[in-house]
Protein backbone atom coordinates (compact mmCIF):
# COMPACT_ATOMS: atom_id res chain seq x y z
CA UNK A 1 0.00 0.00 0.00
CA UNK A 2 2.84 2.35 0.88
CA UNK A 3 4.57 1.64 -2.43
CA UNK A 4 1.32 2.26 -4.34
CA UNK A 5 0.89 5.61 -2.58
CA UNK A 6 4.49 6.51 -3.39
CA UNK A 7 3.90 5.64 -7.04
CA UNK A 8 0.88 7.93 -7.16
CA UNK A 9 2.96 10.78 -5.76
CA UNK A 10 5.69 10.14 -8.32
CA UNK A 11 3.13 10.22 -11.10
CA UNK A 12 1.55 13.42 -9.79
CA UNK A 13 4.80 15.32 -9.40
CA UNK A 14 6.81 14.17 -12.38
CA UNK A 15 4.23 13.37 -15.01
CA UNK A 16 0.81 14.75 -14.18
CA UNK A 17 -0.38 18.22 -14.93
CA UNK A 18 -0.76 19.36 -11.35
CA UNK A 19 -4.22 20.79 -12.06
CA UNK A 20 -3.20 22.51 -15.30
CA UNK A 21 -3.12 21.17 -18.81
CA UNK A 22 0.31 21.34 -20.41
CA UNK A 23 1.82 20.14 -23.65
CA UNK A 24 5.13 20.50 -25.44
CA UNK A 25 3.78 22.64 -28.28
CA UNK A 26 0.87 24.99 -28.93
CA UNK A 27 -0.94 27.37 -26.56
CA UNK A 28 -0.07 25.20 -23.55
CA UNK A 29 3.43 24.38 -24.81
CA UNK A 30 6.78 24.84 -23.12
CA UNK A 31 7.03 28.52 -24.04
CA UNK A 32 3.96 29.11 -21.88
CA UNK A 33 4.78 26.83 -18.92
CA UNK A 34 6.00 29.69 -16.67
CA UNK A 35 2.52 31.22 -16.75
CA UNK A 36 1.01 28.31 -14.81
CA UNK A 37 4.24 27.00 -13.29
CA UNK A 38 6.46 29.94 -12.24
CA UNK A 39 9.49 27.76 -11.49
CA UNK A 40 9.63 26.80 -15.17
CA UNK A 41 10.95 30.32 -15.72
CA UNK A 42 13.67 29.98 -13.07
CA UNK A 43 17.38 30.44 -13.60
CA UNK A 44 18.42 26.83 -12.90
CA UNK A 45 16.31 24.93 -15.40
CA UNK A 46 16.92 21.68 -17.26
CA UNK A 47 17.82 20.31 -19.73
CA UNK A 48 20.97 22.10 -20.87
CA UNK A 49 23.47 22.01 -23.70
CA UNK A 50 26.74 20.73 -22.23
CA UNK A 51 29.65 22.54 -23.86
CA UNK A 52 32.62 20.34 -23.07
CA UNK A 53 35.16 23.14 -23.44
CA UNK A 54 33.50 24.92 -20.49
CA UNK A 55 33.12 22.05 -18.00
CA UNK A 56 35.28 21.79 -14.89
CA UNK A 57 37.14 18.55 -14.22
CA UNK A 58 36.57 17.45 -10.62
CA UNK A 59 38.86 14.56 -9.62
CA UNK A 60 36.94 14.18 -6.35
CA UNK A 61 33.66 13.20 -8.02
CA UNK A 62 33.02 9.60 -6.93
CA UNK A 63 31.71 7.10 -9.44
CA UNK A 64 27.95 6.58 -9.57
CA UNK A 65 27.09 3.27 -7.91
CA UNK A 66 23.69 1.76 -8.79
CA UNK A 67 22.77 -0.70 -6.04
CA UNK A 68 20.21 -3.41 -6.80
CA UNK A 69 19.79 -2.43 -10.44
CA UNK A 70 21.23 -5.73 -11.67
CA UNK A 71 18.81 -7.76 -9.51
CA UNK A 72 15.72 -9.18 -11.18
CA UNK A 73 13.43 -8.67 -8.22
CA UNK A 74 10.26 -10.62 -7.56
CA UNK A 75 7.43 -8.20 -8.31
CA UNK A 76 6.30 -7.07 -11.79
CA UNK A 77 6.88 -3.43 -12.69
CA UNK A 78 4.07 -1.07 -13.68
CA UNK A 79 4.33 0.47 -17.16
CA UNK A 80 2.16 3.54 -17.72
CA UNK A 81 1.28 5.86 -20.59
CA UNK A 82 0.60 9.13 -18.76
CA UNK A 83 -0.01 11.14 -21.94
CA UNK A 84 3.41 12.80 -21.79
CA UNK A 85 5.74 9.78 -21.80
CA UNK A 86 6.02 6.07 -21.05
CA UNK A 87 6.91 5.58 -17.39
CA UNK A 88 8.16 2.47 -15.60
CA UNK A 89 7.83 2.22 -11.83
CA UNK A 90 10.92 1.10 -9.91
CA UNK A 91 11.02 -0.70 -6.54
CA UNK A 92 12.51 1.10 -3.51
CA UNK A 93 15.18 -1.61 -3.23
CA UNK A 94 17.07 0.26 -5.95
CA UNK A 95 19.25 3.15 -4.79
CA UNK A 96 22.35 5.12 -5.72
CA UNK A 97 25.74 5.30 -4.07
CA UNK A 98 28.44 7.82 -4.83
CA UNK A 99 26.19 10.80 -4.10
CA UNK A 100 26.08 13.08 -1.03
CA UNK A 101 23.14 11.12 0.42
CA UNK A 102 21.17 7.96 -0.24
CA UNK A 103 18.85 8.40 -3.22
CA UNK A 104 16.13 5.79 -3.69
CA UNK A 105 14.73 4.96 -7.14
CA UNK A 106 11.16 5.91 -8.00
CA UNK A 107 10.65 5.63 -11.75
CA UNK A 108 12.20 5.92 -15.18
CA UNK A 109 10.82 7.39 -18.38
CA UNK A 110 11.86 8.28 -21.92
CA UNK A 111 11.97 11.32 -24.20
CA UNK A 112 12.07 11.11 -28.00
CA UNK A 113 11.46 13.09 -31.19
CA UNK A 114 9.15 13.12 -34.18
CA UNK A 115 8.61 10.04 -36.30
CA UNK A 116 11.72 9.37 -38.33
CA UNK A 117 13.82 11.88 -36.39
CA UNK A 118 17.21 11.03 -34.91
CA UNK A 119 17.02 14.02 -32.54
CA UNK A 120 14.86 13.53 -29.48
CA UNK A 121 17.08 13.81 -26.42
CA UNK A 122 16.64 16.64 -23.94
CA UNK A 123 20.27 17.14 -23.00
CA UNK A 124 22.77 17.93 -25.71
CA UNK A 125 26.55 17.65 -25.77
CA UNK A 126 28.23 20.34 -27.84
CA UNK A 127 24.85 21.19 -29.40
CA UNK A 128 24.36 17.62 -30.62
CA UNK A 129 21.18 15.77 -29.65
CA UNK A 130 20.72 12.01 -29.80
CA UNK A 131 17.71 9.93 -30.84
CA UNK A 132 16.23 9.64 -27.34
CA UNK A 133 17.01 10.00 -23.65
CA UNK A 134 16.31 7.87 -20.58
CA UNK A 135 15.75 9.52 -17.19
CA UNK A 136 16.00 7.48 -13.99
CA UNK A 137 14.44 9.42 -11.12
CA UNK A 138 15.48 9.11 -7.44
CA UNK A 139 14.69 11.01 -4.25
CA UNK A 140 16.71 11.72 -1.11
CA UNK A 141 15.23 9.07 1.19
CA UNK A 142 17.85 9.80 3.84
CA UNK A 143 16.54 13.32 4.47
CA UNK A 144 12.89 13.14 3.43
CA UNK A 145 10.07 10.72 4.04
CA UNK A 146 8.53 10.91 0.58
CA UNK A 147 9.26 11.93 -2.98
CA UNK A 148 6.64 14.68 -2.83
CA UNK A 149 8.47 16.25 0.11
CA UNK A 150 11.91 15.87 -1.47
CA UNK A 151 10.82 17.23 -4.86
CA UNK A 152 10.69 20.81 -3.60
CA UNK A 153 13.95 20.75 -1.62
CA UNK A 154 17.46 21.63 -2.91
CA UNK A 155 19.00 18.43 -4.31
CA UNK A 156 15.98 16.54 -3.07
CA UNK A 157 15.99 14.59 -6.32
CA UNK A 158 18.76 12.89 -8.28
CA UNK A 159 18.17 12.01 -11.92
CA UNK A 160 20.41 9.96 -14.18
CA UNK A 161 20.33 11.09 -17.81
CA UNK A 162 21.28 8.48 -20.41
CA UNK A 163 21.58 9.56 -24.03
CA UNK A 164 20.35 6.95 -26.50
CA UNK A 165 21.64 6.63 -30.06
CA UNK A 166 20.75 4.31 -32.92
CA UNK A 167 23.02 1.31 -33.45
CA UNK A 168 23.06 -1.65 -35.81
CA UNK A 169 21.57 -4.24 -33.44
CA UNK A 170 18.60 -4.43 -31.11
CA UNK A 171 19.08 -3.85 -27.41
CA UNK A 172 17.30 -6.70 -25.55
CA UNK A 173 17.07 -4.67 -22.32
CA UNK A 174 14.96 -1.95 -23.95
CA UNK A 175 12.66 -4.56 -25.44
CA UNK A 176 11.35 -5.22 -21.92
CA UNK A 177 9.68 -1.82 -22.29
CA UNK A 178 9.24 -1.36 -26.03
CA UNK A 179 7.63 -4.76 -26.63
CA UNK A 180 4.79 -3.76 -24.27
CA UNK A 181 3.99 -0.36 -25.72
CA UNK A 182 1.09 -1.71 -27.79
CA UNK A 183 -0.62 -2.62 -24.50
CA UNK A 184 -0.61 1.02 -23.34
CA UNK A 185 -1.27 2.72 -26.65
CA UNK A 186 -3.62 5.33 -25.17
CA UNK A 187 -3.23 7.80 -22.32
CA UNK A 188 -3.75 6.40 -18.80
CA UNK A 189 -3.45 2.79 -19.90
CA UNK A 190 -1.20 0.57 -17.78
CA UNK A 191 0.34 -2.87 -17.99
CA UNK A 192 2.81 -5.01 -16.06
CA UNK A 193 6.38 -5.82 -17.05
CA UNK A 194 8.13 -8.89 -15.60
CA UNK A 195 11.13 -7.91 -13.45
CA UNK A 196 14.42 -7.50 -15.31
CA UNK A 197 17.89 -6.06 -14.78
CA UNK A 198 17.42 -2.30 -15.03
CA UNK A 199 21.22 -1.92 -15.06
CA UNK A 200 21.22 -3.29 -18.62
CA UNK A 201 19.46 -0.12 -19.80
CA UNK A 202 22.57 1.87 -18.84
CA UNK A 203 25.80 2.24 -20.80
CA UNK A 204 28.37 -0.38 -19.84
CA UNK A 205 30.80 2.22 -18.52
CA UNK A 206 29.51 4.76 -16.00
CA UNK A 207 32.82 6.37 -15.00
CA UNK A 208 32.49 9.31 -17.39
CA UNK A 209 29.69 11.71 -16.53
CA UNK A 210 28.71 15.36 -16.16
CA UNK A 211 27.18 16.76 -12.96
CA UNK A 212 25.18 19.95 -12.43
CA UNK A 213 22.27 21.39 -10.45
CA UNK A 214 19.05 21.73 -12.39
CA UNK A 215 15.35 21.06 -12.47
CA UNK A 216 12.63 18.70 -13.55
CA UNK A 217 12.26 19.00 -17.32
CA UNK A 218 8.46 19.00 -17.09
CA UNK A 219 6.03 21.09 -15.03
CA UNK A 220 6.17 21.99 -12.20
CA UNK A 221 9.91 22.31 -13.08
CA UNK A 222 11.11 22.23 -9.45
CA UNK A 223 14.76 23.32 -9.27
CA UNK A 224 15.65 20.47 -6.97
CA UNK A 225 17.50 18.01 -9.18
CA UNK A 226 21.10 16.86 -8.91
CA UNK A 227 21.73 15.81 -12.49
CA UNK A 228 24.16 13.14 -13.67
CA UNK A 229 24.40 12.93 -17.47
CA UNK A 230 26.57 10.10 -18.73
CA UNK A 231 29.09 10.72 -21.48
CA UNK A 232 28.77 7.16 -22.81
CA UNK A 233 25.58 6.34 -24.68
CA UNK A 234 23.15 3.46 -24.77
CA UNK A 235 22.14 2.07 -28.14
CA UNK A 236 18.91 0.78 -29.64
CA UNK A 237 18.12 -0.29 -33.19
CA UNK A 238 16.27 1.84 -35.72
CA UNK A 239 13.35 -0.56 -35.46
CA UNK A 240 13.19 -0.06 -31.70
CA UNK A 241 13.27 3.72 -32.11
CA UNK A 242 10.46 3.55 -34.65
CA UNK A 243 8.40 1.50 -32.20
CA UNK A 244 8.91 4.20 -29.57
CA UNK A 245 8.01 6.97 -32.01
CA UNK A 246 5.00 5.33 -33.64
CA UNK A 247 3.09 3.36 -31.00
CA UNK A 248 1.85 5.69 -28.28
CA UNK A 249 -0.89 8.29 -28.21
CA UNK A 250 -1.16 11.32 -25.92
CA UNK A 251 -4.96 11.06 -25.88
CA UNK A 252 -7.32 8.57 -24.28
CA UNK A 253 -9.11 7.40 -27.42
CA UNK A 254 -9.52 7.93 -31.17
CA UNK A 255 -9.00 10.23 -32.90
CA UNK A 256 -5.60 9.76 -31.36
CA UNK A 257 -2.84 12.34 -31.09
CA UNK A 258 0.61 10.78 -31.57
CA UNK A 259 2.84 10.96 -28.51
CA UNK A 260 5.98 12.34 -30.15
CA UNK A 261 8.51 15.15 -29.69
CA UNK A 262 8.12 15.03 -25.91
CA UNK A 263 11.36 16.83 -25.11
CA UNK A 264 12.09 20.25 -23.68
CA UNK A 265 14.59 22.45 -25.49
CA UNK A 266 17.89 23.26 -23.73
CA UNK A 267 17.61 26.02 -21.13
CA UNK A 268 20.10 28.82 -20.35
CA UNK A 269 22.97 27.78 -18.12
CA UNK A 270 22.92 31.12 -16.26
CA UNK A 271 26.40 30.97 -14.75
CA UNK A 272 25.94 27.46 -13.37
CA UNK A 273 28.99 25.22 -13.26
CA UNK A 274 29.05 21.84 -14.97
CA UNK A 275 31.50 19.37 -13.46
CA UNK A 276 33.02 16.40 -15.28
CA UNK A 277 34.39 13.21 -13.75
CA UNK A 278 36.96 12.87 -16.52
CA UNK A 279 39.43 14.92 -18.53
CA UNK A 280 38.43 15.58 -22.11
CA UNK A 281 40.82 13.82 -24.47
CA UNK A 282 40.36 16.66 -26.93
CA UNK A 283 37.65 18.83 -28.47
CA UNK A 284 34.50 16.90 -29.26
CA UNK A 285 33.13 17.90 -32.64
CA UNK A 286 29.61 17.53 -33.96
CA UNK A 287 28.95 15.75 -37.24
CA UNK A 288 28.63 19.06 -39.05
CA UNK A 289 31.84 20.36 -37.55
CA UNK A 290 33.68 17.16 -38.49
CA UNK A 291 32.35 17.45 -42.06
CA UNK A 292 33.46 21.08 -42.24
CA UNK A 293 36.85 20.18 -40.81
CA UNK A 294 37.27 17.41 -43.39
CA UNK A 295 36.34 19.72 -46.27
CA UNK A 296 38.75 22.34 -44.93
CA UNK A 297 41.60 19.83 -44.73
CA UNK A 298 40.94 18.60 -48.28
CA UNK A 299 40.81 22.16 -49.59
CA UNK A 300 44.06 22.95 -47.80
CA UNK A 301 45.77 19.90 -49.26
CA UNK A 302 44.53 20.82 -52.75
CA UNK A 303 45.87 24.38 -52.39
CA UNK A 304 49.20 23.01 -51.19
CA UNK A 305 49.44 20.62 -54.14
CA UNK A 306 48.62 23.42 -56.57
CA UNK A 307 51.25 25.65 -54.98
CA UNK A 308 53.87 22.90 -55.23
CA UNK A 309 52.86 22.27 -58.84
CA UNK A 310 53.22 25.92 -59.86
CA UNK A 311 56.52 26.29 -58.01
CA UNK A 312 57.82 23.16 -59.72
CA UNK A 313 56.71 24.51 -63.09
CA UNK A 314 58.43 27.83 -62.42
CA UNK A 315 61.68 26.09 -61.40
CA UNK A 316 61.50 23.86 -64.49
CA UNK A 317 61.06 26.84 -66.81
CA UNK A 318 63.94 28.65 -65.15
CA UNK A 319 66.19 25.63 -65.59
CA UNK A 320 65.20 25.30 -69.23
CA UNK A 321 65.96 28.99 -69.74
CA UNK A 322 69.39 28.64 -68.16
CA UNK A 323 70.12 25.58 -70.28
CA UNK A 324 69.24 27.44 -73.50
CA UNK A 325 71.45 30.36 -72.45
CA UNK A 326 74.39 28.02 -71.88
CA UNK A 327 73.89 26.36 -75.26
CA UNK A 328 73.64 29.72 -77.01
CA UNK A 329 76.78 31.07 -75.31
CA UNK A 330 78.77 27.95 -76.17
CA UNK A 331 77.75 28.13 -79.82
CA UNK A 332 78.72 31.80 -80.03
CA UNK A 333 82.12 31.15 -78.46
CA UNK A 334 82.82 28.40 -81.00
CA UNK A 335 81.93 30.67 -83.93
CA UNK A 336 84.17 33.48 -82.71
CA UNK A 337 87.06 31.09 -82.27
From Swiss-Prot:
Pfam families hit by this protein: Carb_anhydrase (PF00194)
Active site, renumbered: 84
EC numbers: 4.2.1.1
Activity modulation comment: Inhibited by acetazolamide.
GO biological process, one term: carbon dioxide transport
Residues exposed to the Cytoplasmic side: 312-337
Location in or out of the cell: Membrane
Main location (coarse class): membrane
SMART domains, alphabetized: Carb_anhydrase
Domain Alpha-carbonic anhydrase residue range list: 20-278
Keywords for this protein: Disulfide bond, Glycoprotein, Lyase, Membrane, Metal-binding, Phosphoprotein, Signal, Transmembrane, Transmembrane helix, Zinc
UniProt cofactor(s): Zn(2+)
Topological type in the membrane: Single-pass type I membrane protein
First and last residue of the signal peptide: 1-15
Disulfide feature: 40-221
UniProt catalytic activity: hydrogencarbonate + H(+) = CO2 + H2O
Ligand binding (Zn(2+)): 109, 111, 135
Extracellular side stretches: 16-290
GO cellular component: apical plasma membrane; basolateral plasma membrane
TM region positions: 291-311
Tissue-specificity statement: Most abundant in the kidney and heart, followed by the skeletal muscle, brain, lung and liver.
Job of this protein: Reversible hydration of carbon dioxide.
Family (UniProt): Belongs to the alpha-carbonic anhydrase family.
Protein name according to UniProt: Carbonic anhydrase 14
Natural source organism: Mus musculus
